[in-house]
């Protein structure tokens, strides 16, 4: 079962998050029909976005957008404080041979010439936006760079996805380790050593380690678990939302749809759900609109 934990370690000097996201990423793969390299890029982004979302409170939410100039195009993910994520890639059917390390070549798919941006909606008039250059294209390093440079928190982000031969997801998950102000050098050195030796996160998930056990493996001590929450792929789109969008087009455009196709199909970018509007429904919407 997928879930996320929030924890503290080293007497509160270290804040940590870890998640198993295999089912969540599998749902993203199923909905978008991503090929393996695209699945890894989408899954890593979803997992990192989930953990960033877990740092929010209440009804706050955020959007992550990665545009690295690679063949995959843009990756966009929405996450909230409730463990819900939805995401898509511009070009889901991207796959390359494994890289020199024998891993899915995410860097080649994402590209290294572009930006990673995070827009937070904290319920205020203004959105908070942070943007950094892509430094690696492998995504874990890029989210690390975002946290360090845009949010000024010394951090380490690990995200990983393993894909089955039939394109379904074998394992997915991630962790974020953050140092609180005033962390002593001894603690920093110990954590850096652990991070340099730890197995890839996807391998730890595949072995069956829980998020709690992953943090213990990464931190070198048993963390204090503050909160556990279920996580899932969730898109709040609905036919009503698309009705509102169609109404916004105005009478003439709706009439054009009726005359040209006799119906309309709306597709949600984020979850690929399709909504069909019949001729009668379109006529009803046309008659409702004042534009």
Curated annotation (Swiss-Prot):
> In the record, what terms sit under GO molecular function?
protein folding chaperone; unfolded protein binding
CC annotations in GO: cytoplasm
* Disulphides: 235-237, 268-271
Q: Its principal location?
A: cytoplasm
Share an example GO biological-process annotation for this protein: protein refolding
Q: What is the stated purpose of this protein? A: Redox regulated molecular chaperone. Protects both thermally unfolding and oxidatively damaged proteins from irreversible aggregation. Plays an important role in the bacterial defense system toward oxidative stress.
Q: Which family does it belong to?
A: Belongs to the HSP33 family.
Q: What is this protein called?
A: 33 kDa chaperonin
- Species whose genome carries this gene: Bacillus subtilis (strain 168)
């Amino acid at each position: 079962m997928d879930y996320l934990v929030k924890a503290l370690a080293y007497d509160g000097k270290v804040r940590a998050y870890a998640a198993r996201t295999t089912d969540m990423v599998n749902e993203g793969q199923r909905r978008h029909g991503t090929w393996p390299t695209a699945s890894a890029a989408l899954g890593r982004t979803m997992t990192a976005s989930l953990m960033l979302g877990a740092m929010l409170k209440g009804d706050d939410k955020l959007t992550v957008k990665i545009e690295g100039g690679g063949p995959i195009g843009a990756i966009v993910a929405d996450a909230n404080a409730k463990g819900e994520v939805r995401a898509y890639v511009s070009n889901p059917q991207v796959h390359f041979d494994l890289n020199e390390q024998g891993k899915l070549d995410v860097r080649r798919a994402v590209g290294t010439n572009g930006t990673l941006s995070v827009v937070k909606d904290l319920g205020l008039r203004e959105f908070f936006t942070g943007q950094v250059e892509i430094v690696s294209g492998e995504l874990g390093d890029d989210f690390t760079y975002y946290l360090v440079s845009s949010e000024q928190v010394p951090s380490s982000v690990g995200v990983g996805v393993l894909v089955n031969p039939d394109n379904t997801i074998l394992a997915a998950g991630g962790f974020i380790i953050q140092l609180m102000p005033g962390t002593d050098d001894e603690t920093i050195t110990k954590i850096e050593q652990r991070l340099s030796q730890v197995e890839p996160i996807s391998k730890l998930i595949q072995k069956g380690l829980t998020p709690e056990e992953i943090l213990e493996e990464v931190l070198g001590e048993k963390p204090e678990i503050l909160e556990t929450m279920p996580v899932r792929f969730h898109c709040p789109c609905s036919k009503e939302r698309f009705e509102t969008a169609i109404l916004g087009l105005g009478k003439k455009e709706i009439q054009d749809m009726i005359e040209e196709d006799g119906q309309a199909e709306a597709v949600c970018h984020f979850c690929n759900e399709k909504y069909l509007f019949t001729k009668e429904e379109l006529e009803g919407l046309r008659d409702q609109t004042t534009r």
